[in-house]
Amino acid sequence: MRHTTRAPRAAAAVAALQATGATLATAESLTGGRLAALMTEIPGSSEVYLGGVVSYATDLKVEVLDVPRALVEQYGVVSAECALAMAHGVRRLTGATYGVSTTGVAGPDRQEGKQVGTVYIALAGPDGRDAVVALELVGDRGSIQDRTCEEALRVVVAHIPGEEPGLG
């Protein structure tokens, strides 16, 4: 296994999902598939990680993840509302127990009037167990994407019932 600074968080997410018999799917915009890559680095992840959608384009968010176009027009794609709709969409699409999404501005330019480093992570779970985290990150494009993945994995572990957040 390749060791990265993010591997422990991905391993913790896989372990938490395995311990509860839950599954996960990802909907990524600004992270461009990095979160999926981290999950699949972990041995045994195929038991709990169903797959993901990289919905970089707005039309894919609407057409594949079923994000309402009216929501995009009202709040934009860089918003808590869009992040939560993406998480629900990937959960419905795959049948996963949990859907996690990432959207935001990795840079180098602002988007929708939002500063570089503006990030939203959402988790959609069973019985309305949803969470949205807003972050204001500093760094270059790659570091913002990496940090977003780390935080998304932390959110997954923190919101699985009976699991300790770990690696806080």
Model-predicted regions and their roles:
Residues 1-168:
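Short alpha-helical segments enriched in small residues
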